[in-house]
């Protein structure tokens, strides 16, 4: 009997934990992320690691930027992870640990560390994960794992987003060291950055539309007040 979770099972679990509707453009983002994580987690070769967690957390936070209300955003993230039958607190904790690490060291050191050519105190267990990945021919690579690695580089050098040549060089070194498919990873990161820009533009357009609607409502409200005031004055004059 096959007990593997289906996409439908994952979605049901998600909506069990998060019962409120998801706003407009963000709904598609969550649907795609939910399905992507499902397909990764049910794969027989899937194994959780903190770098994947960082990718999930980063992708969620970036694509959900500006979401309101904030408490719903937290609920959506928790349900996203619970839908995969995993612990959202572990994802957040492991992601923060890597972010804190990257915030303390230089760009060259973080790259050397990821490439297994430099040791950093108290991070042996993380480097063991990377080494195991490099030696595992069945490692389940994913776009979210790639985003996690890229996020570490981005934290120490924000110019990587703008400087494609520099970004490509660093990512190629990582691919060679961890035995990852270079073409696939580079394409995934380029697509990720492109999607971030597209969502940011959609969010900006939505905010402009909402602002215009707000101004129209305020104008109509002011016109009603003026009309009412004018009517009252006319009535007083006739008396």
Curated annotation (Swiss-Prot):
Stated role: May be involved in photosynthetic membrane biogenesis.
The species this protein was found in: Trichodesmium erythraeum (strain IMS101)
Pfam family, one: ThylakoidFormat
GO biological process: photosystem II assembly
Keywords: Coiled coil
GO cellular component, one term: plasma membrane-derived thylakoid photosystem II
InterPro entries linked: Thf1
Name of this chain's protein: Protein Thf1
Domain of life: Bacteria
Gene name of the encoded protein: thf1
């Amino acid at each position: 009997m096959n007990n593997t979770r289906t996409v439908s099972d994952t979605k049901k679990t998600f909506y069990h934990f998060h019962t409120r509707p998801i706003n407009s453009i963000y709904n598609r983002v969550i649907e795609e992320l939910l399905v992507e994580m499902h397909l990764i987690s049910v794969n027989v070769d899937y194994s959780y690691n903190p770098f994947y967690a960082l990718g999930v957390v980063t992708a969620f936070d970036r694509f959900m930027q500006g979401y309101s209300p904030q408490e719903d955003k937290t609920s959506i993230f928790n349900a996203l992870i619970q839908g995969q039958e995993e612990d959202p607190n572990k994802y957040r904790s492991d992601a923060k640990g890597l972010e804190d690490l990257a915030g303390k060291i230089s760009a060259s050191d973080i790259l050397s560390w990821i490439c297994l050519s430099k040791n950093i105190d108290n991070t042996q267990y993380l480097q063991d994960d990377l080494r195991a990945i490099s030696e595992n021919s069945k490692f389940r690579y994913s776009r979210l794992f790639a985003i996690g690695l890229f996020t570490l580089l981005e934290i120490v050098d924000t110019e990587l987003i703008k400087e494609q040549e520099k970004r490509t060089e660093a990512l190629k070194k990582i691919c060679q060291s961890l035995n990852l498919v270079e073409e696939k990873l580079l394409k995934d990161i380029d697509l990720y950055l492109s999607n971030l820009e597209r969502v940011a533009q959609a969010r900006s357009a939505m905010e402009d539309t909402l602002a215009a609607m707000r101004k129209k409502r305020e104008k109509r409200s002011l016109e009603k007040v003026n009309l009412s005031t004018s009517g009252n004055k006319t009535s007083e004059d006739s008396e």
